[in-house]
Amino acid sequence: MEGVADFVLRDVLTRVGGYDGCVSEFVRVTGSLLPARTYERETPEIRNGGYTASGTPMVIQLLGSDPEWLARNAAQAATVSPHGIDLNFGCPAKVVNRHGGGAMLLATPELLHRIVSSVRAAVPAHIAVTAKMRLGVSDTSLAIACATALEEGGAASLVVHARTRDHGYRPPAHWDWIARIADAVHVPVVANGEVWTVDDWERCRAVSGCDDVMIGRGAVSDPFLALRIRGQMARAPSDAEWPLVLRCLVDYLKKLHARIAVHHEHGRVKLWLSYLKRTWPQAAELHAAIRRLQDSIEIQGVIENALAQPGRPGAANG
């Protein structure tokens, strides 16, 4: 989730807990060897052995279309990403696709195979190479061929987002297609797409036949979703949890402000609130209250006041 699930949000969400692991925003690979500072900036978890501050393993994800340069960069990334290297063949963004990256590669299973096999050969055997894919570019006609190409190229597991590139993020997600792919390959398949609630998670597992599910936008919309799935919090969100969300937002803002490399903190917080609106109506009120604010310290004050003084926009109930 480029522009959303950065290091700071990974830190906040994994501190909340419930996650087995997480994946970085994609690191774009073109025709050069990336400098070490790229990984230090995008994936600061490498300073902690590839773990978030709460101890959740993080895997570096690479995106590109050139087998040789992906392999060379993967070999370098593997020196600081001991939990694996993930390859992105699922991004539907036009700016990525126009350069032949992300989901556009699903039009050429042969190239998928070349990329994965090149990366697998370049990365030490004890470090897993995994891949994320969609069901295709405009249709599902090559879905099985793409999954097979990734497996035969050496991918240790596949995350399958249950929509095509052209489908974007519009519901529904076609979990039944994940089941077809899982039946066609012999590596573990992880289901992904349109999992917002515990009910969605249960249906996704039942339809896809997958034991494991990757949650993205669902985790951003409900920071406690992983805990709900594990039975460690109430199955459904409630107003009583809103103060916990506000504390997450304050923590997020403080961490954003502490990072020299992060700019436009106010935009990041507003973006997260736009996701939280799906789960909590109070998020819409808070978003409206800070919409015109540009200063992150001022925004933090509004959020802290909402936490301390019930009755203010976006305030905690009670």
Language model features with spans:
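Hydrophobic faces of well-ordered beta-strands that scaffold small-molecule active sites
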Residues: 22-24, 58-62, 85, 129-133, ...
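Active-site beta-loop-alpha junctions enriched in small/polar residues
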Residues: 1, 27-29, 63-65, 90-92, ...
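Glycine-rich, positively charged N-terminal anion/phosphate-binding segment
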Residues: 1-76
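Alpha/beta enzyme core
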Residues: 15, 72-85, 89-99, 110-187
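Short glycine-enriched, charge-decorated loop/helix-capping segments at active-site entrances
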Residues: 37-39, 100-106, 233
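Flexible, glycine- and charge-enriched loops at secondary-structure boundaries
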Residues: 105-109, 171, 238-242
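Alpha/beta catalytic cores of nucleotide-metabolism and tRNA/nucleoside-modifying enzymes
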Residues: 2, 8, 122-124, 128, ...
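Short, charged, surface-exposed secondary-structure boundary motifs
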Residues: 32-34, 168, 222-228
